Amino acid sequence: ATEITAEYRVPFLAHATMEPLNATAHITAGGLEIWSGNQLPSFTRRACADAAGLPENRVTVHTTLMGGGFGRRGELDFSVLATRVAMARPGTPVMTTWSREEDMRRDFYRPAAIARMRGAVKDGGAVLFDAAVAGPSTARQALERWMGFAPPGPDKVHVEGLWNQPYAIPNARARGHVAPDLKVPVGFWRSVGNSYNGFFHESFVDEMAHAAGADPLQFRLALAQDAWRPAARVLEAVREMSGWPDKPEGTGRGVAMCFSFGTPVACVLEVAE
């Protein structure tokens, strides 16, 4: 067998939703009303009630349409800020809107992460896949903010997309290591662990296909057929849609697949000179 190793790193990323964070709050003798495009109405109500010193039954949250959330609007800070400003102007509706700079600077970021991969190929196929990823824990930080504590035990979010891909590799292992507090606030970012683990996993599958001297799509298809037929059909579909392996002169193509939240997704990317 031929052994391959690789290391990958990804940075912290802001959500950068199209609509910067904003909320409107109105405090009267009857209580608090807040208009907020949020992803956690019950937690928003509780946090705003605490900020205003009111019982929850005197707080009404109007969950509006939002110009992108991606996990960022699951946080409570922007709704609480509007509440606190409204407390200084009772009887007057107050709207707070963050600048783009404030929105980027005060995010709860997608974690930075590092992955170290080891694999082996033999007779044109993969026979070993060993992966380790390290980075801050999104789930632990977010749950501590929302509920005041994080349940003990392994963090499945940290390794999703790394251990559960539909490839039949006979010797496979995935490990997650939660980094100590890096003093950078992290939070849920669309697709969560899959956003970096999918990249790590598929980048390394390409390395294994190259080491095996195999076509990268056919290499994946052979592994998927023995693991889960629906995933294999997805690869067959993108093969047909893209006309793989035929391509115009002066172009390059890549393929990737990721099983995320119950669905296998594959894509073919074409780059031209």
Predicted segments, located by residue:
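Structural alpha/beta core scaffold segments of enzyme domains
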Residues: 1-273
